[in-house]
Amino acid sequence: MKLTQPLADVYCKEQKTALEAQRLAQEISFAPMVFQVSRLMVKFGILEYLSNNHKGVTQTEIVEYTKLSNYAVQVLLEASLSIGTVITSDDKFFISKAGWFLLNDPMAKAN
């Protein structure tokens, strides 16, 4: 493949450290789980509920709102914390910036 020099500088040699490459490989391998959890957080209205409650909500409040089991909500919240779409403080959960964009960005919604 013939590449212009700026593209060759990027695509013809390794750009990542071993640690960065390992992190990327893990992100790729977890992508289906990240997608499914995020999709369910939108489908069940949890991200929207968090977005509308700026003072945060407890896990119990989310269970009451969604009518999902406590375990289901716990799994979704814990995964969302790792994904980065939710943050927590003082036993309350809040939507993160990434969660807000997932909920509101037209391109994120389309994909």
Where are these regions (language model features)?
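N-terminal accessory segments
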Residues: 1-111
